[in-house]
């Protein structure tokens, strides 16, 4: 069984269709008398005929024709412009066309030259006696513009075949024919058929752009006019040969050989390659040679020759329907129309039929003809004798299709087609407008995941949730049809606006599309805003509009009503009071805002009447609060059990650096773990069927405790257990004892590589966006196997908060300009609204008074809370230490209004800095800066003398409070851990 492919080791990469057909004919030089060119154009322009021909076949880039009448004019044009093809017509008045072609070839050896001539016996004799060494091809003009297209495509195929076959495995159809008149007739038929088939197969592509690109992967046609040329082309492209069409009689060793086609067929068959062969002949008796070669036969004299050729190619080369035959009777068993049809029917194919078609490479040819190269390459090398059980072969074909479809669907914004959207579809759009900010972000994520398949591991898939975006043009239609702008832009309250929107009707064409989406998505659906401004690189609009979650309802019309109401409620949120106020504050106009809607499966699992994921998270590629061995560029992540609303609302999350997942401050001591870890979480209430929508988009979410999660069985693999008897925290889940959300199996024991995946995604995201990024994600563990999980990327956005933009080099700021400066700073940004500094007087400092100092600070902080003002707090030792000999033992509520906290060492009071660890969660949640200063050893600067010279607002035995007339400026560079407090 060693020959059976292992799909786990196989990574399908998307075919780079954009890199195919790179060499094209854009300009054609036509050398002909005015009369000949008139005959060629048939009283119309060649450009127009070619354009019409291209358009009818969905081809792009039709070439432009430039007509000249003499060799001199031709050379002049060639000198001044680039041409990719020269077409000559005989009967030039002043010089023989063949001599002229030879002269042109001397100067321009790389430009193909084609002679196009009306045919007669006289012309045939003349050509037979001419030196054709300068001519690439001679064609017989029969008055059809399809020949011009065939000539252009033949030359383009010749130019591109070496690169395109080598890079992705584009297939070759070889036509062997020496009759000028015959191949001038056959090639247009052949090209038209191949192009029409490719156009039809391209409909399986997901959008117009993909369809156009996929046409580039069509089989190329090569023309051989003698035996030696046929063998050379075959040998060059034998591994990419889709099929061969050969005449029986043509030149061999310089003479006409009536059996040359048969001999060439024998040459092909001796290679052992299974290649369809069609033998053509004007003598019907030659069909016996075709039978000997196991080839099809076509009578060239048949009046139905074009139809016969089309039929044979359809049957033998993999075009058209895949007809599954009974190998014994050759009766049709079933017909397979496309990829999805094959996926559905592959397990219905009888064993003997499967062996018959696999052994003859019919399956690989089915894929090759449709430019589906990755699965074709695998199936081409399958040896059916390796399979003792044909169900394994069926499963291989099925799994190949699934893997291929998933690969094709990832990273592509498909046009939503209700009959094609299924469980393997990933991202589609309804409408022609914008996707909005979230929609664009999701599309970008999908493309990024596709470009980096190594993000995934065997037990940890990386994906985006199944998504459909309702574009902004649907919003426009909804607003205008229902005449909602007057109430939306007026002064109505939020509840009134929502009521009007819920009464309105969505465009009727959405109904069937939504119904089809419900059939595919088996989980609850998130209805998310995706406005034009949201998640913009320069517009921090995240979280301004509503997101509703809708439980899965089995009755489809109830589901339709609920999702429709959610869509309308999201539309209404554009015009709520807070949205309008935010628009004004950010200098945006409300009537310029447009809303797309993201419909997305909610990540998670069902636990009784609740639905939530194993974890939700937010991660940033920059960490402005690095501690220990962490660096700013290592990034930071916050994760929590349940829905992401808990994180957005500022809940207690587990915070770690993806590059240091074993060093988690919250788990560093038992006291921290018990006090600073998550105890509540959000879940979707599946019993709340949203009978009446509320302005509050969280109306059907419930906040639960860890005991609820424990009862529902969702904690087993993500917690540690506190043993109160032994006073220890044990890794893992044990009966009894308090459960602590440590995610220890994932972060410390690497059950699946969350930290490494986050690190890679943040690095790649920053690289792709060209700036630091923030991502939202969710992880859901496989309920049947806790070692497997799926990581879902929900959003990516650049970090654009203005306070986090720091271009100044703070190391250049002189000490005399500052009250404080530090080279050990946590936090980032510029604070410009603080006028007050509270500092512990160092002159008579004694650590035995630290408890009294804490009381005084609490009292002062209370007055700042009442005034809703902030201040800078400076003092010696570790702030928040439970040991009052090491620092002032304040709790967070005692200093909650401090905007910057400073640990200042003294010559006679040297304590290792705490880096704010005692209330680290509060520092990071509220963006508070933390400075460490040790002036006595040249580490930082504190100008206490300057503060002592300022009048005090309040002064106690231990503290002094100074207020400046104007705000002081505080600057923190979290990337370099530098910070200054400037003098006013």
Residues of each region from the PLM?
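Short acidic, S/G/P-rich loop/turn micro-motifs used as interaction or catalytic elements
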Residues: 34-39, 71-73, 85-96, 120-122, ...
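Terminal, compositionally biased segments used for targeting/anchoring and flexible tails
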Residues: 285-412
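Conserved mixed alpha/beta core segments that line enzyme active sites in large multi-domain catalysts
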Residues: 417-456, 505-905, 922-925, 949-983
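A structural-propensity feature for long, helix-poor, extended segments
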Residues: 466-514, 582, 820, 824-830
